[in-house]
Amino acid sequence: MNYITFPTAQSAVEKIAQEFVIYSQANHPVHISLSGGSTPKLLFKTLAQAPYADAINWKNLHFWWGDDRMVSPTDPESNYGEVQKLLFDHINIPAENIHRIRGENEPHLELKRFEEELSAVISDGVFDWIILGMGADGHTASLFPNQTNFADENLAVIAKHPESGQFRISKTAKLIEQAKRITYLVTGEGKAEILKEIQTTPAENLPYPAAKIQAKNGVTEWYLDKAAAKLL
């Protein structure tokens, strides 16, 4: 497990924000996939403020999501809605650079539409950077233990939360693994035990998608705060 430990969650998201600045200076479109969850909210708030809001050339960055819940963008559960509220409403970014999963649509129709958009915009299926979180059960995006097909050749999949039954659309494991770079952003002592397990046990012996999904031809790294890394 290739990991970097930061003193706090804030210092981890500052590092990611600094890298957004660097990515945005490339003179070509850069495709970044975002994650939902509490730590990414910290990232979006940080990006919306000085110095990052002005230092980033937003027109070069295209944003996607690892997954989203099938709810309206105004619903508090919407991953896209959180980013809109915390970041997009505060910066000048072209509307065509935002590639959201339309959670208000019927799931099967939206799956088809989203896959078509992915194919049209990123024809080789290779994202520049995919930022992922990890749940306490080891899920990532909406790829859950014991129900993820790691061989699924599609670009996206309809997933169902194992407890709530809520529908989501998620990138598939295979699409994520094509990325040039995958960064798992994991914070808080609630994740310490599972991180220790991932570090000490071969991925094939674990049920956790976050342990198994790694960039095939790129870099996979874990950004952890001190609390999450305390058992490593």
Describe the role of every protein-language-model region.
Residues M1-I32:
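N-terminal glycine-/serine-/threonine-rich phosphate-binding loop
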Residues A26-P51:
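Glycine-rich N-terminal segment of FAD-binding domains in flavoprotein oxidoreductases
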Residues L34-T39, L132-A136, T187:
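Glycine-rich beta-strand-to-loop/alpha-helix junction loops that act as flexible
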Residues T46-I56, G81, P145-E153, T201:
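A glycine- and small-aliphatic-rich helix-loop capping segment at beta-alpha/alpha-beta transitions
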Residues I56-D128:
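Ligand-binding beta-strand-loop-alpha-helix segment within the catalytic cores
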Residues L111-K112, A141-N146, I194-I198:
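A short secondary-structure junction signal
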Residues I130-K174:
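Class I SAM-dependent methyltransferase SAM-binding "motif I" and its flanking Rossmann-like core
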Residues K180-L232:
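ATP/nucleoside-binding phosphotransfer catalytic cores, i.e., glycine-rich phosphate-binding loops
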